Swiss-Prot record:
Superkingdom to which the source organism belongs: Eukaryota
GO molecular function: toxin activity
Expression across tissues: Expressed by the venom gland.
Main location class: secreted
UniProt cross-references to Pfam families, sorted A to Z: Toxin_cobra-type
Listed CDD domains: TFP_snake_toxin
Designated name of the protein: Toxin 3FTx-Psa1
Lineage, uppermost ranks: Eukaryota, Metazoa, Chordata, Craniata, Vertebrata
Disulfide bonds: C24-C43, C36-C61, C65-C76, C77-C82
Length: 90
């Protein structure tokens, strides 16, 4: 009878994702994805026209949505791998 609570606790630990880590696309290639660090709850995508081929895109994790610098456009979202080119942003 004493083992029942222990078994239930183990089952709950195995099947519940108690510490979900956000996953975001990173770098300038949208195929790669990384686990965000603790406290980083937002995926971002920065776009500007200063790249070699006219458009530079950088993606990654952040604690909050970064502010745009210069003429860049910044988009943020908060679900796994949501910062790819085809996602909706807020």
């Amino acid at each position: 009878m004493k083992t029942l609570p222990l078994v239930l606790a183990v089952v709950a630990f195995v099947y519940l994702d108690l510490a979900h880590t956000l996953k975001c696309r990173s770098g300038n290639v949208c195929i790669l994805g990384d686990d965000c660090s603790e406290g980083e709850n937002v995926c971002f995508q920065r776009k500007n026209g200063t790249g070699v081929f006219g458009m530079r895109v950088v993606r990654g994790c952040a604690a909050s949505c970064p502010s745009p610098i210069g003429g860049e456009e910044v988009s943020c979202c908060s679900t796994d791998n949501c910062n790819n080119s085809f996602s909706r942003f807020f």
